[in-house]
């Protein structure tokens, strides 16, 4: 990728328009055990809450992991879908005796030990079996989730427990590629019970609202790599959004998506000035500006072409995106679209 040492690349001015960033983690800030290029530079010194659908780690564990990768983060800067699931579950349960929400309720947790701890902290009594007739099943991602746990969850849900999933992401980005996400295992319980869970995480708007209030933000920007969760959730919350091309969603998916981000970028740092696009009949012609790393050029080409294609899609028209005649940089950028 182009680095700031390249004279062509400049820091994003997009981020300066906002007073807080609500930032996804997997695929946006890091992939597995490695930081995404540009993320540390882009986020440095900015008010941020890390809003993650990953429920397998506690806020403290997430903060420690980010710190080990060179980010300046406290546990208070992290909002996980496990936290959101506990809050949602408490609000769904009927505490007709007037007790504090969740205080007298029982929960069966499919997920990490940290999720069980968060449920306990939220006032739930965590049980180990469907035979104890839990009031709610809380389902979050953990590498330790197995057939026995999913079966207990299915038994509890069939017996009437409220079913709350931390998130419905079907895949989880890693350095090796896309792994099975929480939504894929939730689908097994849904198949066995016929019950669709309440989902606490993205793409619902709740997490974004909580994160913005946490910072007292008036102009928050939702940032992520997935259209169907990060961008859809930000849109649902009524916020501007930035889709970075460092994770799941690719250029061609963004070009024809129903979840249209306000901004598109290669990463949280690098930007190339001067790229333009214009419509000529049924063609969008991209002209290059400043040149640099091909991934950054590809993102700039998409950023200027996408609004024209979206408008055409709304009119029922089909446009083809091409490089301007003789523009080798634009041609290279479009060839890199995935």
State what each model feature region is.
Residues 27:
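Receiver (REC) domain active-site loop signature in two-component systems and cognate sites
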Residues 47-48, 194:
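Generic structural signal for secondary-structure transition and capping sites
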């Amino acid at each position: 990728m182009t680095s700031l040492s390249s004279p062509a690349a400049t820091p994003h001015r997009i981020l300066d328009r906002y007073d807080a960033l609500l930032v996804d983690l997997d695929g946006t800030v890091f992939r597995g055990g490695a930081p995404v290029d540009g993320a540390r530079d882009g986020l440095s010194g900015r008010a941020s809450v890390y809003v993650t659908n990953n429920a397998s780690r506690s806020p403290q564990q997430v903060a420690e992991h980010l710190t080990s990768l060179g980010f300046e983060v406290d546990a208070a800067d992290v909002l996980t879908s496990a936290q959101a699931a506990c809050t949602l579950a408490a609000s769904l349960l009927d505490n007709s005796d007037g007790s504090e929400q969740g205080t007298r309720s029982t929960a069966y947790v499919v997920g990490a030990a940290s999720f069980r701890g968060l449920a306990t902290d939220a006032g739930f009594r965590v049980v180990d079996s469907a035979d104890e007739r839990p009031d709610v099943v809380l389902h979050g991602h953990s590498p330790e989730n197995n057939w026995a746990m999913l079966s207990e969850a299915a038994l509890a849900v069939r017996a009437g427990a409220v079913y709350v999933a931390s998130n419905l992401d079907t895949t989880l980005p890693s350095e090796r590629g896309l792994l099975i996400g929480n939504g894929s295992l939730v689908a097994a319980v849904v198949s066995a019970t016929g019950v669709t869970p309440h989902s606490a995480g993205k793409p619902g708007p709740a997490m974004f609202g909580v994160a913005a209030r946490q910072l007292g933000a008036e102009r928050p920007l939702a940032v992520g790599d997935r259209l169907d969760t990060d961008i859809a959730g930000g849109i649902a919350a009524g916020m501007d959004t930035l889709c970075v091309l460092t994770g799941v969603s690719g250029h061609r998916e963004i070009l024809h998506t129903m979840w249209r981000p306000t901004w598109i970028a290669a990463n949280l740092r690098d930007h190339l000035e001067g790229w333009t696009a214009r419509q000529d009949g049924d063609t969008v012609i991209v002209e290059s500006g400043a040149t640099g790393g091909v991934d950054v050029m590809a993102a700039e080409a998409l950023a200027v072409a996408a609004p024209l294609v979206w408008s055409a899609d709304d009119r029922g028209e089909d446009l083809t995106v091409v490089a301007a005649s003789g523009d080798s940089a634009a041609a290279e950028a479009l060839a890199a679209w995935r």
